[in-house]
């Protein structure tokens, strides 16, 4: 989504990257004008990250793979049991957050930076649920990836609260967060 007057102005804009764009992008886009009017929110470019898939089951499999930092064996077993009940669902996978973050940092962001009027020093990540878990994982393992993190209802429960161990490790080596965080 682009701010008003984007095409005629030659200024650089902050950018917000949002995962689960199929579920979140429309609501965010429709809320923006009011939020910007009432809250003096600056104009920015909204980039939705989503999947080209063969349906909701395929989408869920890709989402589970990309937004989770580990293989959660309890969750994986439960998902496989569900798949047996519902039939021909795709193979369950998880633990691809490192690769997904590399893809965002090395492919998506350079593409957006080159193609649009982006302020490279003003980039925000926005994610909910497993997207929130991914945001926390990114914050604690590669905080320089974004200046701000908007994290809604993160799936802290994932893999016996693995993300809390990642946070403890980060806290051992850092006194402050390198970004602004909105939970």
Question: Across the structure, where does each feature detected by a protein language model lie?
Answer:
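Non-catalytic cap/lid and distal C-terminal segments of serine-dependent acyl enzymes
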Residues: 1-183
């Amino acid at each position: 989504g682009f701010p008003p007057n984007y095409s005629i102005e030659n200024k650089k804009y902050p950018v917000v990257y949002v995962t689960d764009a199929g579920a979140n992008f429309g609501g965010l886009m429709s809320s923006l004008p009011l939020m910007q009017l009432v809250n003096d929110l600056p104009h920015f470019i909204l980039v939705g990250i989503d999947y080209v898939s063969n349906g909701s089951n395929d989408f869920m499999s890709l989402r589970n793979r990309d937004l989770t930092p580990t293989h959660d064996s309890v969750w994986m077993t439960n998902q496989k049991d569900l798949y047996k009940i519902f039939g021909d669902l795709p193979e369950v996978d998880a633990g691809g957050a490192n690769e997904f973050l590399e893809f965002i940092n090395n492919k998506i962001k350079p593409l957006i930076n080159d193609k649009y009027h982006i302020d490279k020093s003003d980039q925000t990540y926005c994610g909910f649920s497993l997207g929130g878990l991914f945001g926390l994982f990114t914050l604690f393992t590669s905080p320089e990836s974004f200046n701000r993190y908007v994290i809604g209802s993160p799936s802290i429960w994932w893999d016996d609260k693995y993300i809390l161990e990642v946070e403890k490790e980060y806290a051992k080596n850092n006194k402050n967060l390198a970004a602004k965080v909105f939970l």
